[in-house]
Amino acid sequence: VRRPILKSPAFLAALSVLVLGAVALQVSLARMQVVLRKLPIYAKDDLPLRTIASSVPGWERVGQDNILSKEVIEELGTENYLSRVYRGEFNGKPVIIELHLAYYTGMIDTVPHVPERCFVGGGMVQDGATQTVPIPLDLERLSIDPYVDQAEYGSVYSAVGENFQSVRMPFELDSRLKLRVTPFLDVRSDRRVFAGYFFLANGGIASSANDVRVLSFDPQTTYAYYTKVQFTSWDVESSEELGVIAGSLLDELLPQIMRRVPDWIEVMEGRYPPDNPNQPTPSNG
């Protein structure tokens, strides 16, 4: 008589090994504080990106914000976005620059939408090498945050934001803020356009899609988010020039952007959000 396979000693032994292995893996991950499932997290007061000021010193909005269709939003993968055109001045000449922001959180399974893919898919052709260029900021407008352990988190600046509130900047802002820029040619109009971007992710800065996934999926963090910050302009002559102009606009807008993402120091210290599982244990004293 043929023994049913589910009752055979060999099968039961193999099943036992698999079950014990799975349990051992979970125990090991717990001991190492490895978190595989990331929870969504949002800015304090759930401020959306579209509430960023339309006019700041040296820059003003042109027209109305670009409201994406339902189909495009579905492709983008988030409803928390901003697509806006600003007009300013560079070297005594007017300059137009488009700012695009998009916020993602939780189990981030979307591939970041970046110009190298989206612009080419939209009919443009790449017209030169991709470069990573500096974004010069006026750091004198910022101050080192005295409440942050710089030995643990690196240099962390704070800025005076809206309503004179203090806003923390990304980790190591002075050394890591760079723009990944690619030139494109619109074959229909025969015009050249430069597009560049970086990411804010889990309190840090990344300049590539690969780097942002590493930051967002830190195995020892409970939460995950990233925000794409993208600049596009037809009025610049080089990648470096786009970086300089982006810096001029970010001098005014970066504190507002950071107010619309989680304060990662508060998250890491367990003080935010209110249901953070890592919140500090109240003292009995």
Question: Which residues make up each language-model segment?
Answer:
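Short extracytoplasmic
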Residues: 44-75
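Short, Lys/Arg-rich N-terminal segment immediately upstream of the first membrane anchor
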Residues: 1-8
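Primarily extracytoplasmic/secreted proteins
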Residues: 22-24, 34-36, 221
